[in-house]
């Protein structure tokens, strides 16, 4: 287990007590075509200036349900890159934030802390190029977060929340 960022605890109960966001109550009008997600890491990579220069930073990007890039941020710490994206999202006005599904894509594995930050920001879909931890999967299940790992141009693994995805065609 990894720590959850809440006083060093690995408890989902503590996150549940702190979380006021209900991801299932956030309205969305359409399903995301799962094959449209496959190109998102490449699109994110095209905007990674620091990674191009150093090869040593992580990135996090926010896409809307039309797969349009909203933000991409880089940092040496994967959690910091996520913080930058969620911070930028939270500065937007409420109507813009409520326009539909948002997809957070990370260039790393998916830890519980990243799931926690995604849930707290009200983002419904989290996808990473690496694997999610066991605790990340359990948290995604508890909070109805669509969790996708090993996202690449050939496919992905959906660990939870496939009802937000259209797998036809």
Task: Give, region by region, the residue ranges found by the protein language model.
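Intrinsically disordered, low-complexity regions enriched in acidic/Ser/Thr/Pro/Gln residues
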Residues: 1-60, 64-65, 69-71
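Conserved active-site and cofactor/substrate-binding residues in soluble primary-metabolism enzymes
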Residues: 2, 7-10, 32-35, 39, ...
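Short flexible/disordered coil segments
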Residues: 36, 162-169
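A mid-sequence, solvent-exposed acidic-amphipathic segment
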Residues: 43-45, 49-107
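Short beta-strand-to-turn element immediately C-terminal to the catalytic PLP-Schiff-base lysine
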Residues: 63-64, 159-161
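A broadly conserved detector of short glycine/acidic/proline-rich loop/turn motifs that flank catalytic sites
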Residues: 66, 110, 163
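Feature captures the catalytic cores and cofactor-binding loops of soluble hydro-lyases/lyases
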Residues: 79-159, 167
